[in-house]
Amino acid sequence: MSEITQLFQYNTLGALMAGLYEGTMTIGELLKHGDLGIGTLDSIDGELIVLDGKAYQAKGDKTIVELTDDIKVPYAAVVPHQAEVVFKQKFTVSDKELEDRIESYFDGQNLFRSIKITGKFPKMHVRMIPRAKSGTKFVEVSQNQPEYTEENIKGTIVGIWTPEMFHGVSVAGYHLHFISEDFTFGGHVLDFIIDNGTVEIGAIDQLNQSFPVQDRKFLFADLDIEALKKDIDVAE
């Protein structure tokens, strides 16, 4: 029997949308569950990028910091990435065109997938969510997020593809973060163009959904689920 690949998700994107930003899991604990992934930091201070078992923070001032094990996160998703499909992208395409090609390799539409794209990007457009106090709705914070575009940059996109039925737990479709080859630029991917690269698609067999069970704010939060889903559509 082949080894089971488990996606570990700490907290839900819906809780993040509601303004629950306090970090309650350490990077050290998170990395026990996977070597590739995405998330955010305490007080939603930038974007979390997990690549090859190391964690990085893309900050709003356009800097990248490698994170120590004691730093805490309010939300993250990581997986021990194992490529099931690998293909070369040898001509220029947009993000949407590449995503269509990726999905052509899926066996059905109801399983999570891990995504890793390494290559050269004529355009990479990202954002970094700015630091905010808990209680402020994520969609409101995102209206003032810094965005940056770099041209002819080499690096890696990491992320998760989520089935529609799990929208709210995460964002349905692609949730992708980028980090440059020299670890000086990165963030939450908004759009890109790639002209040469390698795409890896990993199968995910199980979802391990973990919750901040010691966090009273989470335990007693009164969440408007339909409103949160709409906020995810706007912010992500």
From Swiss-Prot:
Leading EC class: lyase
Gene name in the database record: aldB
Protein name as it appears in the record: Alpha-acetolactate decarboxylase
Catalysed conversion reaction: (2S)-2-acetolactate + H(+) = (R)-acetoin + CO2
EC number, as in UniProt: 4.1.1.5
Top-rank taxon: Bacteria
Family (UniProt): Belongs to the alpha-acetolactate decarboxylase family.
Keyword terms, alphabetized: Acetoin biosynthesis, Decarboxylase, Lyase
Listed GO MF terms: acetolactate decarboxylase activity
GO biological process annotation, one example: acetoin biosynthetic process
CDD domains per record: acetolactate_decarboxylase
Function per UniProt: Converts acetolactate into acetoin.
Keyword Transmembrane helix listed: no
Pfam families the UniProt entry points to: AAL_decarboxy (PF03306)
Pathway participation: Polyol metabolism; (R,R)-butane-2,3-diol biosynthesis; (R,R)-butane-2,3-diol from pyruvate: step 2/3
UniProt xrefs under InterPro entries: Acetolactate_a_deCO2ase (IPR005128)
